[in-house]
C-alpha cells in the first residue's frame, strides 16, 4: 500500500491470512525487519519508516518481491517484473529474485522479453508466439543456447 511505510507493508505481509489489526501486525521488532532486508542492494533497510510512495521503482519491486515470498508460496508468478526499471536496477532486482527463489526453493514462472534473463535464470525456457509454444528447452540444451540462437529459432518458427 503506497500510503503505508515499508515497515507497515512488511508487517502486513508477515501476517497474511490472519485476522489481525495493524497495531498487532506492527509487533515485529525493527531489528527483525532490518534483518529481513539485509543484503537487498537498493538500501531498503534505511527506508523502514518511509511511505512506499516515496520509494524508487526498483525499491518498490524489491519490496513487492520480498513481501510475496514471506509466507513461502508454492508458486511465484512474475510478469515482466523488471520491465519498467533501468538496466542497473533491473539487474539488481533480478539477482534478488534469483537469490530468494533459490534459497526458498520456490517454483517460479517468469514472463520476460529480456532474452539474457530468459537464458541465464531458471531451469526451463518456453517461448510463445501468438499463444503457441515455438521453443521449449531445458538442461544442457538451454545452457548451450545463445541469444542469437534463440532469435534464429524464433524467426524460423514464425
Regions found by a protein language model. Name each.
Residues 65:
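Hydrophobic anchor residue at the start of the ABC signature
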Residues 112-113:
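H-loop/switch region of ABC-family ATPase nucleotide-binding domains
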Residues 76-79:
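Catalytic Walker B motif of ABC-type/P-loop ATPase nucleotide-binding domains
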Residues 132-155:
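Conserved beta-strand-loop-alpha-helix hinge in the C-terminal portion
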Residues 91-103:
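Helical segment within the ABC ATPase nucleotide-binding domain
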Residues 4-16:
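Q-loop/switch helix immediately C-terminal to the Walker
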Residues 87-89:
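Helix N-cap at the start of a conserved alpha-helix in ABC-type nucleotide-binding domains
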Residues 68-69:
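ABC ATPase C-loop
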Amino acid at each position: 500500500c503506497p500510503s503505508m511505510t515499508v515497515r507497515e507493508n512488511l508487517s502486513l505481509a508477515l501476517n497474511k491470512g490472519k485476522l489481525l489489526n495493524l497495531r498487532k501486525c506492527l509487533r515485529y521488532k525493527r531489528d527483525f525487519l532490518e534483518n529481513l532486508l539485509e543484503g537487498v542492494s537498493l538500501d531498503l533497510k534505511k527506508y523502514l519508516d518511509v511511505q512506499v510512495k516515496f520509494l524508487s521503482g526498483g525499491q518498490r519491486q524489491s519490496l513487492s518481491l520480498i513481501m510475496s515470498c514471506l509466507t513461502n508460496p508454492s508458486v511465484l508468478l512474475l510478469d515482466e517484473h523488471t520491465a519498467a526499471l533501468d538496466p542497473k536496477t533491473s539487474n539488481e532486482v533480478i539477482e534478488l529474485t534469483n537469490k530468494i527463489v533459490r534459497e526458498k526453493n520456490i517454483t517460479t514462472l517468469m514472463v520476460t522479453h529480456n532474452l539474457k534473463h530468459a537464458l541465464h535464470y531458471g531451469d526451463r525456457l518456453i517461448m510463445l508466439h501468438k499463444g503457441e509454444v515455438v521453443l521449449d528447452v531445458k538442461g544442457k540444451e538451454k545452457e548451450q543456447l545463445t541469444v542469437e540462437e534463440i532469435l534464429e529459432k524464433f524467426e524460423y518458427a514464425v
